[in-house]
Amino acid sequence: MLKEKLKKYKIILASGSPRRQQFFKDLDLDFEIRLKDVEEIYPPELKAVEITNFLAELKANAFEGELKENEILVTSDTIVWHQNKALGKPKNAEDAFQMIKSMSNTTHEVITSVCFKTNTAFTLLHDVTKVTFKDLSDESILYYIENYKPYDKAGAYGIQEWFGFMAVTKVEGSYTNVMGLPTAKVYEYLTTLV
């Protein structure tokens, strides 16, 4: 449906995330993947959605001057926001353990910003999902880290994996946002372009 309406456009997904790529396939959208190395550093005074907005826009700006007239670039960034602090991807097993342990028996926010950029304009949107974990044993956290190696995931966990099935007691908002892309919002925005 939307795929037909977007025929005159070429969607460029600037993400190496297998989950985001799968979401675009599952949304039945034709797209091309283009990647750039971008150092994901943000000013320390930024908080919550300011961080993800900044990083999604930073990633899009790496393509400045390279987009053709019919191309729509899509970049995004996801963080876990917990105890007034951003939890990105863990550096190692100890970092992953500390992140997950800090979220045990509490609620945190998963924030994703998505930037849509053409050669003449850009639009930023974001989504926030609240996720609650049960009280987690050290043993279950260590098992997850050892067996699933969540080093490519913000907050050191994947809700779609064993850990999510075992640990998550409540989700308020978009489930796909927790996996890295608020698909309903992305789809809705793309429908406004045609």
From Swiss-Prot:
Instruction: Give GO terms: molecular function aspect only.
Output: dTTP diphosphatase activity; UTP diphosphatase activity
Site: Important for substrate specificity. Where? 19, 78, 160
Keyword Cytoplasm assigned: yes
| Top enzyme class | hydrolase
For this record, an example GO cellular component is: cytoplasm
- Main localization is cytoplasm
Tell me the compartments it is located in: Cytoplasm
Assigned keywords, A-Z:
Cytoplasm, Hydrolase, Nucleotide metabolism
SUPFAM superfamilies this protein is in?
Answer: ITPase-like
The source's superkingdom equals Bacteria
- The EC number on file is 3.6.1.9
Q: Could you say which cofactors this protein requires?
A: a divalent metal cation
Q: Does the keyword Hydrolase apply?
A: yes
GO BP annotations listed: nucleotide metabolic process
InterPro entries for this protein: ITPase-like_fam, Maf-like
Xref: Pfam families: Maf
Q: Family membership, please give it.
A: Belongs to the Maf family. YhdE subfamily.
User: What function does the entry list?
Assistant: Nucleoside triphosphate pyrophosphatase that hydrolyzes dTTP and UTP. May have a dual role in cell division arrest and in preventing the incorporation of modified nucleotides into cellular nucleic acids.
Record-linked NCBIfam families: maf (TIGR00172)
Matches recorded under HAMAP family = Maf (MF_00528)
- Descriptive protein name: dTTP/UTP pyrophosphatase
The species this protein was found in: Flavobacterium johnsoniae (strain ATCC 17061 / DSM 2064 / JCM 8514 / BCRC 14874 / CCUG 350202 / NBRC 14942 / NCIMB 11054 / UW101)
